[in-house]
Amino acid sequence: SFLIENNNWSEIMPVTKDFKTIDEQIAVLDSRQLKFKSKKKAAELLRKYNYFDLINGFESMLLKQGTPNKEYDDVYFEDFKDLFFFDMKLKKYTLAKIFDVESRLRTSIAYNFAETYCQTSADTMNYLNPAYYQAPPVTDTNLTNRFHHFDLFRTTQYWPNGNIRTRAFIDDLKREKEYVGQYENPPFWVTIKALPLGSLYYTFVFLNSTVKEKVLRDFGMELDDSAAFEQALFILKEMRNQCAHLELITRFKIKGKPSLNYFNDIKTKAGLARGDLFYIDVLKIFKLFGGIADIKREIAWFYFRLILKGRQKIADKAISKMGRKKLSVW
């Protein structure tokens, strides 16, 4: 692990940062009055995990306020360690919830679409035909463009000399995935497994009302809930990306998007915050799809463990950044 350090803290945007050894990283933290229970163990941790991941993500929450230079007041390196591993553990629970929703969505879309449009072998490949989906209104240029270039609808394109320029989606998939390539005409419930969550999200968006209503009923919702469900999927997609890139999910924050009605539908249905969305709002979305007792238990355990360490102020700051300061709200 290594640290890239800015030499001039008065600059808002540094040109670059200088490399620092593990010992130099600890010296920098020392100079900012960060306390250590064991510098040896701190060094071992910094060799395993990047300084940027361990320190930078949490420092704005723990730095002393109102000082021109970076400075800590009664903050320990071990506080950063506790926050970092809490975030890591929460990622595991969060991803498990998202994977569950994702798996159920794949199953529901494939089953209900096939039941409606792919009942015979002659109809097997109808899921690649945009005629069986609902095109967005032409006034929505962004969504219309996505529809016209959607993965499932991609056909083979040729150069004037007859050479292939781009392969059809299904042909590419047959080459990449052995379980798809074993079929001449792979059924939807096989190919849908290969779609990333982003493509799965748009597959739901582009379903017509007949299929969409069936999918929503599988999740205990009605067609009127379509916008809220779509917004929930988008938020979970963003959270999944944050987990996949090992970003801090305890600092998760998402602003409203005009194209998704600023998430107003899901805010109403799930009782989310009226402004920006935080981790607690993701938890409320999970509640629409199943239980959240395991995540709530993990948050409570983290909080009480820090109380026992005499670090309640750190726990308060952490859950406050996640959406609510009072544990009872969670």
Q: What residues fall within each predicted segment?
A:
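Extended intrinsically disordered or low-complexity regions, especially N/C-terminal cytosolic tails and loops
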Residues: 1-238, 250-330
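Acidic/aromatic/glycine-rich contiguous surface patches that form carbohydrate-binding/processing clefts
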Residues: 246
